[in-house]
C-alpha cells in the first residue's frame, strides 16, 4: 500500500470534483477523505458514529440529515459537501443502488458540474431492507445504474465501484440456522456487482479482498469499521486514482509506529 500524506492528497485532487455515493460506510469514506484533505489525523470514533450533522470538519449539510426528522428508514436523505479554494467533495446517502432518487442525483450532474471522480457502493441496504427478490432486484438495479452512469457522465469521469467490506453475523443471527444472513448476502452481492461492473468496463476495487485479514478493525455491529480501517481504505482509493491518471505515486516507507503499518502488512499474509 502506498503512503499518501495530506499534502499529497491536496495535490492529487487539486481542482477536482469528487463525489461519493452510498450508505453509512460510504459516508465514512467521504468523511475520511475530507479530513485527510486538511490534516494527517485520523477520524475520531465519535465522528464516524455521527450522521446528518450540520457541519463536519468545515463541510456543510446541504440536504436532509438534521434539517429534517432523523430516522433509519429507506427514505432517509443526507447530502454533504466540502469546498475549499481548490477542492470540492460531495456525498449523497443512498439506501438503494438505483432508484428515482438516484435519477435526481444524475440530474444534478447534468445541470451542474460533472464529477471528475465518482466513488460508489450500495449493497447492504439493497439486500436487507427490500423485497424477497432482493438479489434479483439488486442485479437488475446494478445494470440500470451502470448503464445510466455511462449515459450521463463524461467519458473523462473516473467511476470507481467498491465492493462491500466483509460483514459479520448480527447478534440476532445464528449462522448454522440461517439460510440468508448478512455475511453471505454481502458475498453474493459482491460477486454480482463485480461481474456487472466488469461487463460495463468500470473500475472496480475489491474492498472485501483488501480487508479480509483486517476483521479486528471492524466494529462490534459487524458492519462498520474503525478509523484505522477507513484511512487504509482512503489510501487504497488514492493509489488507484493516481495510477488511473498516470500520476507518480508518493515514495517513502510507512513508519512502523503508524497504526496503518500493521494493517498494510496484513495484506501480504496468507489467508488461513
Region spans (language model):
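A short acidic-Thr-Gly-centered motif at the start of a beta-strand
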Residues: 4-13
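Intrinsically disordered, low-complexity segments enriched in polar/charged residues with Gly/Pro
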Residues: 5, 65-68, 209-210
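Conserved SGNH/GDSL esterase-like catalytic core that processes O-acyl groups on lipids
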Residues: 17-136
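Alpha-helical cap/lid subdomain in secreted, periplasmic
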Residues: 88, 92-272
